[in-house]
Structures are given as C-alpha cells and as structure tokens.
Amino acid sequence: MPLLTTPYAELDLIRQPEQANDPLQAFDAADEYLLAQLHDQAPDANCRVLVLNDSFGALAASLAGQLQVVSSGDSHLGHLALEKNLARNGLPFDSVPFVPASEHWQGPFDRVLVRVPKTLALLEEQLIRLQGQLAPGAQVIAGAMIKHLPRAAGDLMEKYIGPVQASLALKKARLLTATVAERPLAKSPYPSCYRLDVPALDLINHANVFCREGLDIGTRAFLPHLPRDLGRARVADLGCGNGVLAIASALANPEAEYTLVDESYMAVQSAQENWLAALGERPATFFAADGLAGLEKQSLDVVLCNPPFHQQQVVGDFLAWRMFQQAREALVVGGALYIVGNRHLGYHSKLARLFRGVEQVAATPKFVILKARK
C-alpha cells in the first residue's frame, strides 16, 4: 500500500476492519489536501486543532506531536484505526485524545479539519456544537472527494459558522473553508423522534443513526418474526442501531439477557436511551465495538442482526460477512443467528458456509428473514 506523504509526516496506514489483500487505502486526496492547506497556514505548535470524522486516523496521526490535536467522530472503527495507526508509525498511544460523538469536546479551537460525513445530519450536529467552541479568527476547513461533496455541506457551514470559500479542485478533491463570524446560537434538532405502533414504542435517533427519521424497511420486515419463548437466553443485537430489535425482543422475552452493540457511538447512545424509556431499569449491556470481536467464544444463545451493506461510501457485503463470522464464534453449539437482508444479497448461501443449518423464516418481495443454527 502507498504511504501517506504530507508536509507533516510520512505514514504507513491501515483501514479497519482489516481485510486480507484489501484493495482500498486508508487515506485519499481530500486528506492530503486538508493537511497541505493547514501546513500552508504555518500554524505554530500551540495551535489547537479539532479533527472530525477522520475515517482511519490519517489526519490526526499526521498532526500528532506537532500541533495540539483532538480527534472526534462517531465510528468506533475509526477510533480503533487511529490507535492502531499511531502505534504502527511509532507514535505515542495517547498523543491524540479521542472524543466519541456521543460526548462533547472542549474548545476553544483555532482550526477544525472536517471530513464531510455521508450523513449530513451528523455534520449539522457537529457544526452546532462548534458554536462557542472556536477561538477568534478560527477556521473550519471541510474536505471531501468532489463526488461525495453535496452543496448542502457548504450551506450548513455558512449557516452555523460563517462565510464559506470553496477551493479549486485538486486530484478530484475540494475544500470548503468557513471563517468564524457572529452567528445566532442554534438549538440542535437532534435527536429525532418517531412512534412505532407494533410494538408501541416512542423511539429517538441521534444524528448519525441509520434511517434517522423512521423505521427502516428491513427492520419493519424483521420485527414480526423475532424469536419468542427464549427463556433465559443470552441475546445480542449486533449492529443494534437505535436498539429497536433488542427492545421488541425483550418485551416478548422478559427473562432473556440482552447485549446491544454497534460501531456507532450515537447508535449505542440512542439504544441505551430507548431501552430505558421502554424497559426502565431492566439490566442490559451496551457498548460501541468492532461487532462481537471482544466477546468470549460460545457466550451467546441468540444473535439478532440487520447487517449493513456499506462502510461510509464503500458498498459491499464484507461487513455482513464479518458479522456472520463473529456471530458463529460467539454462539454456543445449537445457538442461532437471525438476520434480515435484501433478497439479492444472497445471504443464505453465505450463511450455509458457516452454519450447520440455514432456514428461511419469512420473506417479503424485497427481504428475506433467515435463521442459521450453529
């Protein structure tokens, strides 16, 4: 893989999760452009820089030890990539503090480097949080590959930060620079709320949760077919989102024990708040993680999963395949994985390579619900 070479450093970077013979690199031209732009401004060593949505740590690791850097984002895999890439390049483990998107950072910051996220609601929430956290004369510099840079990103920066200047294109990347100006303090419109009729639930979604404004159609197809009569089963909701699968299952299985895990900090935050609203103080475990990678082998009886088919702008089934493998490792012999997926993704044949038996529980014209037994 090529090295990331910038005026700040030459780094050997890897993506997360790691894949054998991964054809994708851990940085792109937008990362290079952001670092070059910052270097051209010649900030001194005391310059406090906030890095937002740094996919695999390319920005923060490049600046580690040279400026006062804080990184923040919603991806646990992004956090893990930053830690691994710091170590991989001989940089101190703690040289870049990381603040999950479910928490708030503390300014003031002189510069903010932003990778424009796929979900503009996350960008809006971050820009609102920046109000009152920027030093006089501060700049917010957002970067993206042009094909992933919507006009609305600049509009949001103008609305919440100040006047925006777009750069020339360079290697198919573009920067948007907002100089801090007086703006009215905004009230965040997040989390979003919606009501589910069956089961009767009022649910909230923080800004970066998938299908933020309502129940996604895959989950809607899955809900009527969740397993019942689980007794004291140990159940995990893998890629839990706002927790609706686990909550619906828990309402039907009052003795079961639940673990809710997602790689999105805002998803886990949403799930925890929704669980509390629906089930009160009933115990459950919540954490942001690389799926079930940290769980003991054969520690679960049931796994529920509505697997994602993209990582940021990269589409594919590699994340789903990884989740299926993790579920197999975590399940006891005789345990079961229940999933929902688009028909065209061919999950039945993939599961058959890992599990003793795979059966179709239900189907709609678009989705299939499968049960795979270990």
From Swiss-Prot:
The keyword Plastid does not apply. Its main location: cytoplasm. It catalyses: guanosine(1835) in 23S rRNA + S-adenosyl-L-methionine = N(2)-methylguanosine(1835) in 23S rRNA + S-adenosyl-L-homocysteine + H(+). GO terms for molecular function: 23S rRNA (guanine(1835)-N(2))-methyltransferase activity; nucleic acid binding. Keywords: Cytoplasm, Methyltransferase, rRNA processing, S-adenosyl-L-methionine, Transferase. InterPro entries: DNA_methylase_N6_adenine_CS (IPR002052), rRNA_m2G-MeTrfase_RlmG (IPR017237), RsmC/RlmG (IPR046977), SAM-dependent_MTases_sf (IPR029063), Small_mtfrase_dom (IPR007848). It comes from the Bacteria. This is Ribosomal RNA large subunit methyltransferase G. It comes from Pseudomonas putida (strain ATCC 700007 / DSM 6899 / JCM 31910 / BCRC 17059 / LMG 24140 / F1). The gene is rlmG.
